[in-house]
């Protein structure tokens, strides 16, 4: 015979009543999709009008997901993956196309832009703290025409909020968190929009400080006394301990940064924006543990750290030529990364490799872009990019 179970009755009731509830909630209201304006093709247009694969996250989206870095919002973009081993150490991957992420001199297959400033670099891309960000645009597939040789697999664009004319505004934010397995953490930021000359000049200042508490312990242990790999072992190899390096929560990190943008509206058709920013990342060990040592524990024999400091400067000119819109961007990017990792527990003798201290001084010089859009049908880009990269790699 037929018998109605409590679960079946509950499901049937929910399915029957759901349309009625929906009709009551939406009665008298219009339902539509939110229009997102992007500039991925170097002109302002709706994301729905672009015949390409692009995902955009607005500032409201980023706030809702509490995004602080690349790895926080990458999971919401289907074609994007971020490989990260710690703060300030990330590799952006589109559609699974990637080079050796462990090589510091490997050329990236995906480019990262902060406004009109290219952050693409050999090895790992620098971390961008998500403070005062207008939106994030992710372009999947080759983008070399507009974003250079690094954009073979895709391009990530991080767009900051620009200075606003005739509006004095200050925004502060602070949050703290704690857990049973590690140190406490906090995020603090301040944003100041300052009008200098009515309808002509405005300044926007951003400052932030963040601490991510460590949660991995380096516990006491000895070096292995057997040679599983067949390499030569120094005398007394099995008698060394790590008493001098024992530390709790040793993978913590701190981030300090600032950004300043000065916008000058020359007239209705021409404007310039000068942007300067700096960020310093001081982090401990990698976010990795050894399950043989215990949960969230490792046995290391020397301190581990990563220091990542960079400064950026950008000058952008935008104007109407009558027959086309012109965007000229000149930028400079200086970055120094120092990394110290312990390899004591490895039985093989390591030859010199691209490790230790990594210093890079990449400079990006002007590119120009013009687009004609008279009838809305004919549109052509004229694009020129002239990058110069100088890098010094020191091994130890």
Question: How does the language model describe each region?
Answer:
Residues 54, 62, 74, 136-141, ...:
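Non-catalytic regulatory/gating segments with a bias toward low-complexity or hydrophobic composition
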Residues 239-396:
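Outer-membrane beta-barrel domain signature, strongest for Gram-negative TonB-dependent receptors
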Residues 171, 180-283, 311:
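Transmembrane beta-barrel wall of Gram-negative outer-membrane proteins
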Residues 70, 91-93, 113, 126, ...:
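N-terminal periplasmic accessory domains that precede
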Residues 102-103, 109-110, 115-142, 190, ...:
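Short acidic/polar hinge/loop motifs at secondary-structure boundaries
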Residues 39, 71, 75-117:
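Extracytoplasmic beta-strand/coil segments of soluble accessory domains associated
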Residues 46, 90, 108-110, 166-170, ...:
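Outer-envelope beta-barrel architecture signal
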Residues 1-65, 71-76, 268, 272:
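N-terminal Sec signal peptide and the immediately downstream disordered periplasmic leader
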């Amino acid at each position: 015979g037929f018998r109605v179970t409590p679960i079946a009755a509950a499901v049937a009731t929910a399915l029957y009543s759901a349309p009625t509830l929906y009709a009551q909630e939406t009665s008298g209201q219009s339902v539509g999709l939110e229009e997102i304006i992007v500039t991925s093709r170097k002109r302002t247009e709706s994301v729905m009008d672009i015949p390409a694969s692009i995902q955009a996250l607005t500032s409201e989206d980023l706030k809702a997901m509490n995004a602080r870095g690349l790895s926080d919002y990458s999971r919401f973009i289907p074609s994007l993956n971020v490989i990260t081993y710690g703060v300030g150490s990330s590799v952006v991957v589109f559609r699974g196309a990637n080079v050796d992420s462990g090589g510091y001199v490997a050329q990236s297959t995906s480019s990262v832009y902060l406004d009109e400033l290219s952050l693409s670099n050999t090895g790992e891309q620098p971390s961008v703290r998500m403070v005062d960000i207008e939106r994030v645009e992710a372009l999947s597939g080759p983008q070399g025409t507009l974003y250079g040789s690094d954009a073979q697999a895709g391009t990530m664009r991080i767009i900051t909020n620009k200075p606003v004319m005739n509006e004095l505004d200050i925004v502060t934010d602070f949050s703290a968190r704690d857990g049973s397995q590690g140190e406490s953490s906090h995020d603090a930021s301040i944003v100041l929009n300052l009008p200098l000359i009515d309808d002509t000049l405005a300044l926007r200042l951003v400052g932030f400080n963040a601490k991510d508490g460590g949660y991995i312990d380096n516990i006491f242990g000895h070096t292995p006394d057997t040679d599983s790999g067949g390499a030569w072992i120094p005398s007394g190899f099995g008698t060394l301990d790590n008493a001098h390096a024992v530390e709790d929560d040793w993978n913590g990190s701190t981030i300090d940064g600032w950004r300043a943008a000065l916008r000058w509206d020359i007239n209705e058709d021409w404007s310039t924006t000068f942007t300067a920013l700096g960020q310093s990342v001081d982090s401990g060990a990698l976010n990795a543990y050894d399950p043989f040592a215990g949960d969230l524990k490792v046995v290391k024999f020397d301190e581990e750290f990563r220091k990542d400091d960079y400064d950026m400067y950008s000058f952008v000119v935008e104007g109407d030529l009558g027959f086309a819109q012109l965007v000229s961007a000149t930028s400079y990017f200086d970055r120094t990364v120092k990394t110290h990792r312990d390899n004591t527990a490895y039985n093989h003798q390591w030859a010199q490799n691209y490790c230790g201290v990594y210093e890079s001084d990449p400079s990006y010089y002007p590119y120009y872009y013009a687009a004609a859009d008279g009838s809305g049908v004919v549109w052509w880009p004229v694009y020129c990019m002239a990058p110069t990269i100088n890098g010094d790699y020191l091994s130890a």
